[in-house]
Amino acid sequence: MLVIRFKGWSVKLDHQVGGAGKFGIWSFHGSESSYVPDMETILRHAAIRPAEPKEGAEVEVLICDSRMPQDEWRAVGTGVAAYEAER
């Protein structure tokens, strides 16, 4: 499981499901909540750059749907990558 840590919160990602340019598209881990920007939209993916970060690397994160055009992704910031075993 890939965990991206921000100041005060984190995003848990399960596995890479695709890519777009230099971004990897990852699905949220099953224990994570979905991102719900409005009552009609549920987003369960994150676009991250680099696509497959090394432990401790800085990672840019955007919330998206795997079918969304890149200009509709929602930036959430930059965090630090960590790999954790499933609990």
What does each of the following model-derived ranges do?
Residues 1-3, 17-23, 53-58:
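A short, compositionally biased
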Residues 2-6, 11, 42, 59-63:
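Hydrophobic beta-strand residues in large extracellular and virion-surface proteins
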Residues 3-4, 25, 42, 48, ...:
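Short hydrophobic transmembrane-like helices used for membrane targeting/insertion
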Residues 6-28:
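Short aromatic-glycine-(Arg/Gly/Cys) micro-motifs in beta-strand/loop hairpins
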Residues 11, 33-34, 68:
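Short, isolated positions in well-ordered beta-strands
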Residues 23-41:
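A short, exposed loop/beta-hairpin motif centered on an aromatic-Gly-Thr core
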Residues 35-53:
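A short, charged, amphipathic alpha-helix used as a generic interaction element across diverse proteins
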Residues 48-87:
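Short, mixed-charge low-complexity intrinsically disordered segments
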